[in-house]
Amino acid sequence: EGREPVIRFKLLDGAISFADLVRGEVTYDAKNLGGDPVIVRSNGIPTFTFAGAVDDINQKITHVIRGEDHVTNAAAQVRIFEALGANVPTFAHMPMLLDSDGGKLSKRLDSLSISNLKAQGFMPEAIVSYLAALGTSVDPKIAPLEDLATQFDFEAMGRAPVRFDLDQVLRLN
C-alpha cells in the first residue's frame, strides 16, 4: 500500500478504569478506543500518548492535570503505565477553555498568553485569581497565591466548557 510502518501498543481487551479528580471514576472499554494506539510514528518520533507516559514515569509525576480533550488518551496511558510496571498517576481532566465567543482557544492565539496579558498591564494576581475560579461556581476575587492553592478543589470544577472572559479579569485588575 506504500504506507510507512508505525509502532502500536497492543491494548488488551476489557475495561480500563482510572481515578479523575474532576470526572470521578472513569471507565472505558478498550474495544471502543479506536484500536491499538500508535506510540511511534513512521518518522520514528514517539507520539504524545507514549512520550507523555514515559516522561511522567521518569519524572515520578503523581498528578496529570490537562484538558478534557485528553481524557481518552488517559485510558491508553493507563495501560502503558501498567505495562511498564509504573504507578498510574491521578488524573484531573479540566473543562475545555473557550474564547469569549465560544470557540476553542488555541495555543497559537498569543493574545491570551500570560506574558501578553502581563504586557497589557494585567496584574499576575488578577490573572491567577480569575483562572483559579474559572469553571467553578466561586465568584473570582483577588487572593494570595497560597490561599488560592489551599482553597482549590477539583471536585468543585464543573465539566461543561468554560469561556475565558477578559472583562472579568479586567474587573479584578
Feature roles, as predicted:
Residues E1-L105, S113:
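Active-site cores that bind ATP or allylic diphosphates and position pyrophosphate for catalysis
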Residues T72, L84-N173:
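Catalytic adenosine-cofactor/nucleotide-binding cores of aminoacyl-tRNA synthetases and other
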